[in-house]
Amino acid sequence: MASAAVQNKTPRKVLKKSTRDSLIAYSFIAPNFIGFCVFTLVPMVFAIALAFCAWDGRHAIEFIGLKNFVKLFTTDKIFQAALKNTVVYVIGTVPLTLACSLAMAVLLNQNVKLRNFFRTVAFFPYVASLVAVAAVWNMIFNPSMGPINMILNQFFGVAVENLPRWAAGKDTAMITVILFSVWKNMGYYMVIYLAGLQGCNPDLNEAAELDGANRWQQFWHITLPQLRPTTFFVVIMLTISGFKVYDQMYMITQGGPGTATMTLVYYIYNVAFVNTPKYGYASAISMVLFVLVLLVTIIQFRGSKGDN
C-alpha cells in the first residue's frame, strides 16, 4: 500500500517540478520577447502596412495601394540615385574591408614585437567616436588646407587646380566615404579574422612546408579554405551594414554634393523627418531596402552552401 502511494505521488512531483522549471525559463525569456514584439515586430508590421498608405503624421492615414512603389521606380530620380549609390558603396566597401582586415590579421597573427600594441592601434578607429574621427578625416582631406592635398601638391607636383576635392567633389565624394568606412571598420573585422586564424590547424601548414610549399601557397591553399566560415560571416555583416549605411554620409558629406552620396537610409531619413513628413513613402523605401538585403543574403547563403 505504501509503495503504491509513493508511486502515485511521484508523477505529480515530477509534473510540478517540470511546470516550475518551464515557468522559470519563460520568466527569463519574457522580457526579451516582449521587447522584441513591442520595439521590433509591431513597428515592422506597421511599416509594411504604412508602405501602401499616405500619411504625414497629422492627417488621417489614406490607403493608396501601390502608388508609392510606382513612384519610386518611375519618377523619383533621387531614390534611383540613392539606390545606385548604395550598391556602389557596398561593392566598394565589402571587398576592400575584407582584404585589409584579413591582411592585418595575418600580419598581426605572427610572433612580432609590439604585436598587442599594433592590434590595439588597428582596433582603435572602430571604438573611437564617429563624430571625432569624421572631424579629423574632414580636416585631413580638406581640399584647400588638408595635408593630403598639400603632399600631392608639394611632393608629387599636382597643380592646385587639379587637386581632388575629396568629400566636396561630386566625382570623389563616394570614394572618400568608402575609404573612411574601410579605415573605420577594418579593425573590428581584423579581430574576427584573428579569432578564425587561431582555429586553423598548424599541422597542415607544417606538412605542406615539408612538401615544399612556400608561404603564399600555404596561405592560399590551406589557411584561406579554413577561414571560409569566418569570411562568410564577415561578408554577410559587411553587406548588411553597407546597405544600412547612414552615419558616415551624415557626418562627412550630408548626402552631397547634390545626390553623389545619397544612400537609401539617408533618403529614408530625409523623406520621413525633413521638411514635410511622408511616412508612407519612407516606409515604401524601407520595404525596398528590406527586400534587397534579403535577396542578397539569400544568394550569399546559397553560394556558401555550394562552396561547402
Please provide the spans of the model-predicted regions.
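A structural signal for multi-pass alpha-helical bundles of membrane permease subunits
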Residues: 18-308
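Short, Lys/Arg-rich, polar N-terminal cytosolic tail immediately upstream
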Residues: 1-19
